[in-house]
Amino acid sequence: MSINIGEISIPDLPIFFSMFLTIYLIAYFIVFRNWKPQIRPEASSCLISIFHGSPAVFLATRAVFSSSERSFASANTAAQNTVLDFSVAYFLTDLFHYIVFNPNDVLFIGHHVATLFVFLTCRFLVFHGACAILGLLILAEVTSACQNAWTLAGARKNDPESRLAVKVYDLLSPPFYAFYSIVRGVLGPLFFGKMVAFYARGGAHGVIPNWLWISWAIVVGIAITVSILWIWNLWIELFSERKANKIRVDKKIR
């Protein structure tokens, strides 16, 4: 799709990219200008994630369910392509953020490159499969708002001038971990399994090549595995910290 300005038709992707880049720069130079230099880039990344996550869930849900064809192999609709453009623009912006400020963070850079591969091939190579990709996007971003609030609080929890951040971080951690665990540890694998089974049975024969859906499956499978390991480690840290705090309290009482 494209946006018409007068007699000029501008593709969605450049407009969305300009939007996310502008939000990032405003966040870095204005919104978080008083934050420590070490955490300003991360906070700015969180802000563009906030502008992407929940809107992407809403737009993707609407794009999928407004279509009469909702097969994992059905042709992409114009609305679905717009959502793909929206997400590609976000991941491109965030990828540049990591390349500039965290070039050694190979895990996130690799994640963003792989995600862009999935979105771009669905959008511009085969023109099919958006229902599957957007379904995964919904599951990936439905936890975004909570995760970004938790991340922003975590970035400032060690700042003596921000006691509120510690309280927010401690308050959000258990429910966020539980929500994330259900979505990424249960719903995500179930949807992923359904998608792989569909393609393995030849459901997309003739429209999505085997090498491509297998590539998608590898990317998504690795992402789900890493997410599960990440949240598992956070649960371990949470229980370890609470156990240590309980021991300290018991010692004080004695």
Swiss-Prot record:
InterPro entries assigned to the protein according to its UniProt record, in alphabetical order: At5g14285-like, TLC-dom
Record bears the keyword Cell cycle: no
Disulphide bonds in the chain: none
Pfam families membership: TRAM_LAG1_CLN8
Localization: Membrane
Coiled-coil boundaries: none
Alphabetical keyword list: Membrane, Transmembrane, Transmembrane helix
SMART domains: TLC
Topology relative to the membrane: Multi-pass membrane protein
Claim: Membrane is one of the keywords in the record: yes
Domain spans labelled TLC: 38-248
Gene Ontology, cellular component aspect: membrane
Chain segments annotated as transmembrane: 12-32, 45-65, 82-101, 124-144, 172-192, 211-231
Name this polypeptide is given: TLC domain-containing protein At5g14285
Lineage summary: Eukaryota, Viridiplantae, Streptophyta, Embryophyta, Tracheophyta
